[in-house]
Regions:
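Short beta-strand segments enriched in small/hydrophobic residues
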Residues: 18-21, 55-71, 81, 170, ...
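Hinge/beta->alpha junction and helix N-cap segments in small-molecule ligand-binding domains
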Residues: 68-77, 95-104, 156-166, 182-230, ...
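Flexible loop/turn connectors
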Residues: 230-331
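N-terminal helix-turn-helix DNA-binding module of bacterial transcription factors
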Residues: 1-61, 74
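Alpha-helical recognition/docking segments in bacterial nutrient-uptake
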Residues: 62-169, 173, 234, 238
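Short acidic capping loops at alpha-helix termini that bridge into adjacent secondary structure
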Residues: 177-178, 209-213, 265-270
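Short helix-capping segments at alpha-helix termini
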Residues: 88-89, 202-209, 235-237, 260-265
Length: 331
């Protein structure tokens, strides 16, 4: 027997009219009531039939932007690109922070899509695997992945491999000896591509790859870089330079610790980062780094998702942007 509004109302201890208002995304309903009604509707399997059919033609005039960490400077710059687009848009941009939890990311998108609270979604730095991203493809709401290439969804990304090749080439040409590489152990495609670029550069220059020169951090923070510095310096491989695909904040932490130990950067120890965050220019010495076109990524993403929503772009589209190697004083 089909589930009715009355069934949901009785379980939620509200009126059928209230349930109808929630399902149709009407205002003047408390968030607590809305969440309770929607949870019961989902529990009773109401979404796949009545809600989906009833709301299929309704627009929310909203674009959901799902991020893994709203405190990240990298994410903030992409968001600035989304917000500063030259295009006049009739959509509200809604931000959702999943704090890097892939289950939350998937469940959040499903809920927003099925409740028709968004017309499209932008995933920035998604931690979900390609297999799991099928969930996003199977919903009726268009979705774009930013900062990583994705074969099953539209994506806007940078050529991470080439960026790492340029950075490693530069350090090799400085004849700095062993070059350490600091990566983030949170395995994802961009980080794997950056590590691959490091390896390719070594190979092209006839330098053997040494696993002992790979160091891992848990996140792109200054504290992680400070903690990593002693591990690099005390390593039997004795590196005299480090390339930091993990990000600029780790590189800055390394520079700070080097200065505290009276090690001269870049004379005694060269440091190259990845991202070109605003802090890269402020640190002394200023950080040599790989610049990612974060504003451009955001701008391309918002324009592409609008074209998808409004039916102007139907084919899969993958936009690759190039990095730029920025030489400053740390290497």
């Amino acid at each position: 027997m089909p589930v009715t509004l009355k069934d949901i109302a009785e379980r939620a201890n509200v009126t059928s009219a209230t349930v109808s208002m929630v399902i149709n995304n009407k205002p003047h309903i408390s968030e607590e009531t809305r969440e309770k009604v929607l949870a019961i509707a989902q529990e009773l399997n109401y979404y796949p039939n009545a809600i989906a059919r009833g709301l299929a033609t309704r627009k929310a005039n909203a674009i959901g932007v799902i991020v893994p960490n709203l405190a990240s400077s990298y994410v903030v710059r992409i968001l600035q690109g989304i917000k500063s687009t030259n295009r006049d848009i009739d959509y509200t941009v809604q931000l959702f922070d999943t704090i890097g939890q892939k289950e939350t990311e998937t469940q959040l998108f499903q809920r927003l899509a099925r409740e028709r609270r968004i017309d499209g979604a932008i995933l920035i730095g998604s931690v979900v695997s390609e297999k799991e991203l099928k969930v996003f493809r199977d919903e009726s709401v268009p979705c774009i992945v930013v900062a990583r290439k994705c074969d099953i969804l539209d994506s806007v990304f940078v050529n991470n491999t080439q960026g790492s090749i340029e950075a490693t080439d530069y350090l090799i040409k400085l004849k700095k000896g062993n070059i350490a590489c600091a990566v983030c152990y949170k395995k994802n495609l961009p980080m794997e591509e950056r590590l691959e670029g490091y390896k390719l550069s070594l190979k092209r220059h006839g330098v053997s790859f040494d696993e002992n020169l790979i160091f891992e951090v848990s996140d792109d923070t200054m504290a992680e870089g400070e903690a990593l510095f002693s591990k690099i310096i005390e390593s039997p491989t004795k590196p005299s330079a480090v390339f930091v695909p993990a990000g600029d904040m780790v590189a800055i932490g390394i520079i700070k610790m080097a200065k505290r130990t009276d090690m001269r950067v870049p004379d005694d120890f060269a440091v190259v980062g990845y991202d070109d965050l605003p802090a890269a220019e402020v640190i002394e010495p200023a950080l040599t780094t790989v610049r990612q076109p974060k504003l451009e990524m955001g701008d391309h993403a918002i324009n592409l998702i609008i074209d998808k929503i409004e039916g102007r772009e139907t084919a899969f589209k993958h936009k690759e942007l190039l990095t730029k190697f920025i030489v400053r004083d740390s290497a």
